[in-house]
């Protein structure tokens, strides 16, 4: 409208160093870690088979840098920034380890999965970190 170049990056469940472990903006991994550190079972809503695409914060940073420098974007594109694979909430709980407590479900999508082909095509971006490779380091850092 005003000759302003824009691009929107759509992030999928960003995790990484310094993530919130409590409060309204904490993600499931942080919530589980907080519960474990407090000697509580990990609370899973529903059956835990909901799947999410988890994306490492360093990969998100890289996508932002590439988008800011790319000559291939700026016409209002919406680009998914996600790993392109997903894990169930039960799988995340198993990675953290510990007792699980299943409670009533909430209304939410059963699955999110990023189609990151546009990020690859326009930005040359690909994820570098898988959640299952990062969790052991995270557990050591927080003392689990």
Task: Identify the meaning behind each predicted range.
Residues 17-18, 122:
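Residues that scaffold the ATP/ADP-binding catalytic core of kinase and kinase-like folds
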Residues 2-6, 33, 107-108:
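N-proximal short alpha-helices
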Residues 21-22, 73:
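Active-site loop immediately N-terminal to the catalytic Tyr-X3-Lys motif
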Residues 18-21, 47:
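Conserved catalytic-core motifs of eukaryotic protein kinase domains, centered on the activation segment
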Residues 1-17, 100:
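Conserved beta-loop-beta element that borders a ligand/cofactor-binding pocket
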Residues 36-144:
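C-terminal substrate-binding subdomain of Rossmann-fold SDR/epimerase-dehydratase oxidoreductases
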């Amino acid at each position: 409208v005003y000759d302003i170049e824009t691009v929107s990056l759509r992030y999928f469940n960003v995790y990484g160093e310094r993530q919130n472990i409590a409060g309204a903006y904490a993600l499931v991994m942080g919530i589980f870690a907080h519960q474990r550190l407090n000697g509580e079972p990990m609370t899973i809503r529903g059956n835990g088979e909901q799947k999410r695409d988890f994306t490492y914060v360093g990969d998100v940073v890289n996508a932002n840098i590439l988008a800011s420098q790319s000559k291939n974007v700026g016409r209002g594109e919406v680009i998914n920034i996600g790993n392109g694979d997903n894990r169930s909430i039960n799988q995340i709980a198993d990675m953290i380890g510990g007792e699980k407590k299943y409670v009533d479900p909430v209304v939410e999508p059963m699955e999110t999965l990023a189609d990151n082909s546009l990020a690859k095509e326009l930005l040359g971006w690909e994820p570098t970190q898988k959640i299952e490779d990062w969790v052991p380091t995270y557990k050591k850092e927080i003392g689990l």
